[in-house]
Amino acid sequence: MYVTKIEPVTKTKYKVFIDGQFAFALYKGELSRYHIAEESVIGDDIYDSLRLIVVKRAKLRAMHLLTDMDRTESQLRTKLKQGLYPDDIIEQAMAYVKSFGYV
């Protein structure tokens, strides 16, 4: 897999594009820890590790959003989408909170 572009979102958060398509958002520390830079190649093992990190972050974010106030499934999806989580990861986070009966 080829990292085509890294676009800053905030001072510490970046959008990572792999093979021309948005893959996920990572923090500056994660980019340096996994040696991710524009025009670099990442292996499947690193990609899978990054996906696991983002899935865990999405689940924690969903749980945090529900501690502040009750939200509908649609509201929760919208907030996760605003947080730059990919659709398939949002689905995993939604399944996670549904498994506890929170949504």
Role assignments for model-derived ranges:
Residues M1-V103:
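An alpha-helical, amphipathic repeat domain used for nucleic-acid recognition
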